[in-house]
Structures are given as structure tokens and as C-alpha cells.
Amino acid sequence: MRILGLDLGSKTIGVAVSDPLGFTAQGLTTVRRTNKEKDIAEIKKFCDEYDAKVIVIGLPKNMNGTIGPSGEIAMAFGKVIEEELNVEVKFWDERLTTVAAHKAMLEADLSRNKRKKIVDKVASTYILQGYLDMISRK
């Protein structure tokens, strides 16, 4: 069983998957959002392909730790995923993951155009890896 990581944006969803042992996260793709039903169908494909029973969703929090409108949207979407796909949804504080993703891509000397295309996939990898690191310490 693997674990999926999602970075939910208003236009795209970054998708990452754990290795079979749950130690490392690898970025899979970025899905262009269309509507809720199609977004859920895309996520279901990944759940089926990787036999994922747990999905970690990045939870946007304000810098003071409170949950704002984006966080509420992520939590509502997570609830829909949980109900429709019969998977366990976990939330992971995603503060600064996109910043870290941009920094890593700049250090890798990726062009602005390339960074724009993969930033959500890279951010989903950071989200999932943070969660995997936390559960491995338990």
C-alpha cells in the first residue's frame, strides 16, 4: 500500500506517491482542475493504480497557525475524497512548501516556464515527504 500526497491549487492539483515501504515521496504529475467530479475521478485513478488507502492533503494555514478560506476549501475537498473514494484523508501543514519547491527548482537552475509547470508536483512531494518523515519517527 502506498500513500498519495496532494497539493490543491485553484487551477491544478500536484500529485505525489510514496514508495511501497513508505519512506520516500516521488512527484507524479500535475492535474489541471476542471470540476469536482473530474478532479475526484483523476484522484481515484491514482488510488487504484497505486493501491493507495491514505491521501495526505496539504492544508494551507496562515502564518499564525489559523485556517483561512483556502484551508477550509481543502478540508471540505478532503471530506469529499474520503467519502467518495473510501480512503483515509490526512492533512499536513503546507506552509512554505511552495516556497521551498521554488527554491529547490531555482537551485536546480530550471527555467521559469519549467518551474511553473511542475511547482505543484514538487510541492506535493514536500507535503507527502513531511508526513512520511513524521510517521517514521513514531
From Swiss-Prot:
UniProt family annotation: Belongs to the YqgF nuclease family.
Residue ranges the record marks as coiled coil: none
Annotated S-S bridges: none
Enzyme Commission number(s): 3.1.-.-
Protein name per its UniProtKB record: Putative pre-16S rRNA nuclease
Compartment(s): Cytoplasm
Transmembrane residue ranges: none
Protein role: Could be a nuclease involved in processing of the 5'-end of pre-16S rRNA.
Keywords assigned by UniProt, alphabetized: Cytoplasm, Hydrolase, Nuclease, Ribosome biogenesis
CDD domains named among the record's database cross-references: YqgF
Single GO MF descriptor: nuclease activity
NCBIfam families: RNAse_H_YqgF
Gene Ontology CC: one annotated term: cytosol
A GO BP annotation: rRNA 5'-end processing
InterPro entries, alphabetized: RNaseH-like_sf, YqgF, YqgF/RNaseH-like_dom, YqgF/RNaseH-like_dom_sf
Superkingdom field: Bacteria
Any single Pfam family the record assigns to this protein: RuvX
